[in-house]
Amino acid sequence: MNSGVTSLDLADLAVHVFTASEEDFLINSLVFELAEELLVVDAQMFVPDAREFADLIEGLGKPVRQFVLSHNHPDHFLGFEELCRRFPGVPIAALPGVIDYVERLGAEIVRNRKAELGDLVASRAIVPDTTLAPGEQRIGGIRFRFEGFDDAEAESQVVIHLPDHATMAVFDLACRAEHHCFTVLPQFDHWLEVLRHLREEAGDVRHLIVGHGLPTDTSALGATIEYGTVAKQVYGEVRGADEYAAAMKERFPGRGQQKWIEFSALLLYRVIYP
């Protein structure tokens, strides 16, 4: 699968989901297209994808009000170097825990990834400069609700609710039912609590936007709860990243993107850190 764009037409709002190629982990970045401006969330990992995403933003022909970083994983923030070059002066908002993480570890992450991937990744990590406050905001006349969670799938993560548009962006907290999930922190109990909370909140949500792969529906929350429950059990039974990845592939033979579980196992067991 090559990179592509899925656009959700929600009457007075459009949500454009840029999805990187399968080779590049199907990473998602979002543009909320409002009547007169854009709210842009996440920036990709690889420079070519960030450039292509910037082209999408530019092609919409509206000013960018703000960037938002959904969580502290580098596959969602390294591309901000390119976006900030293309759209100078736009503030980047994130939860306090996300800002702290990028500030403390961003430079080391860039060094490590650049040693492996060279010019495919950014030369520096851009630290968000604006604190994202949880709660409800009206942006361009549209009601947004930002909800923050710590120590679940990531150290710090926001969920974006569009209460009037039956849409929720949960990013890496959930994955599509046919994919392996990224399990990079051993905080399984709390992650599962968060997922159950989101499932209860979902109500009439029709569009669920995940961090990797095409938009889906709320069935992905239940599928991720099932996956996380098994992941917790496997993590308690095996020794090391290789055994963990092998066991998860055996338990979920029908799920694709096996390299995702192999890579996330390296992070889960701190073979790769940060």
Where are each of the predicted segments found?
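Short Gly/Thr-rich strand-loop-strand
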Residues: 2-17, 133-134, 140-144
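Conserved beta-strand hairpin/beta-sheet module of binuclear metal-dependent hydrolase folds
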Residues: 5-59, 158-172
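Short Gly/Pro-enriched turn/cap motifs at secondary-structure boundaries
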Residues: 20-22, 126-128, 148-151
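Short catalytic-loop micro-motif centered on adjacent basic/acidic residues
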Residues: 39-42, 66-70, 145-146
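Metallo-beta-lactamase
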Residues: 45-46, 150-226, 230
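Active-site HxH/HxHxD metal-binding segment of metal-dependent hydrolases
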Residues: 55-136, 236
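Accessory terminal helices/loops
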Residues: 201-205, 214-274
